[in-house]
């Protein structure tokens, strides 16, 4: 389908029953779903529901993106296998999507037999067609863990601004991009060791092949978003520039993923098998439902295929993915729809401010998921513009639009209709001019949704709601009800109000599916579709007792949501204070009397069995406790107890501390963690070097009976150099 065809379809009524495959980007299986993710899934779900309401054959496909080094290392950190980790995360992600009404036809995993077979098939087809190259490359290598390191697993000092602890590809302080080899004093995030350079054979997809450039120049002309088209043309350059570079599609063992056929110890890079995971998830669905999978993906398929993504992964979905499909003999995407980023209260999501909001915390705090669906929809359009969740505006808009304008229409009319007219509408009222206006607007609202102009659809819907409320205010049914002589007028007013409410509910159904279900049950009607705009309520079907469909947002709920997501040192201090009052130290792990104990430079101090002497607040104030970030860690040669920690305490230089916690932690487990240190302890010279402080850890009073050491780890949001007080 060309861009002009797509525009014509989006501008008007559906042209016959279409077959459509839709995907959202796959969430990575090493973290929680947050509201930034939900922008995309809600956007996609609204579009899918819109098309279902037209009666099209449409399948919404998703999966967890499960492969790669981060998943492998996260699993190791948690003491589980990668498969155990991704199975747990899949359940968490599925729970969150269900909570927000994201209606996948199949939510699967990229770690599946279907994905392995499809990835191998596509790779071998590309190899047969001459699109796979093999060459030696030099990479950073961790000599301790014996593994090659991705750029983001190398840190060091920025070569430009000299900021510490920066990633191997760019500086978060000054914004400079560079090669990992440019870092000053680089170290492996995995082990803390200095990386070395090592060569390895890698496999490349030859995106630089002239056939790829020719195909992509033609394919880009069909993209619906001008911003995407312009960005792709920038990447492609002018004819003859040859700006496209070959794409490394392989990684070396150890790696969690699929091994490349005929290349032992080499694995597909996650970005090769992740988009193939769209097809794998769909194939799994086809096998269960008896659908013809090949008819949807073969080169001459007449089906449609749309990908909803964030603008940060446009490169993969508009260059690599369509080229992979084209030259492996498959159909290419009909279109790719990219959205912008989410900010909260005008700023990036922040753990310290509590605005890095997880989906589960939103649900646990008792907020209605359809509030957020409505607010995001009101902000979304067909462009790649960023959107902002302003929490004050969120509260005001939901309370005004959904409660004040929309659901109140039903609550104002239902009681009179049930009490006076047995819940049956007046047949003649269904021809009221106001209702004709609403019915006439439904096709345009549906077209706005299909064009991804959700904000326009909702603005038009709320303008209609204003008109309905104006009608009710003018008719004054509460006044009409006082005089039996006004029964006909009262019946008409309530009937017009409820039919208008049905039409508004139809207009809002893609955004508020659960409210729509409640409306359908209340009115005693079948599930609403766009074709039902002209099918008014019937006097033959009485409405049922009205149940509240939506409550107002309480400001206290917003406060509770922020508190639930805020990484706060006050919370840590309060817990320590409460623990002390109960006879337990701040580092209490299990409530069995474990105490916080400082770990001196040489070895872990044994906690005193008895209570410590009482000290004054002045004595305590002498201790300068600071948040420290462990930027490097290594075992001390010749010692079976000590680890050498390099700590960032917010000063111009790092500090060196020896700590007797080797029995409890491997060096790679500690790198990147925050902890608490005594910053004003006099330096101590040891045979291994100078120790410039001590870190804090907890241990049981009787370490022989209950062994274990536990370093103190502040909540997210704490920063190196912050005082603990």
Swiss-Prot record:
Reactions catalysed according to its record: tRNA(Met) + L-methionine + ATP = L-methionyl-tRNA(Met) + AMP + diphosphate
Top-level EC class: ligase
Motif residue range(s): 'KMSKS' region: 348-352
Required co-factors: Zn(2+)
GO cellular component: cytosol
Its EC number(s): 6.1.1.10
Motif ('HIGH' region): 27-37
Quaternary structure, from the entry: Homodimer.
Protein name (record): Methionine--tRNA ligase
Organism expressing this protein natively: Burkholderia pseudomallei (strain K96243)
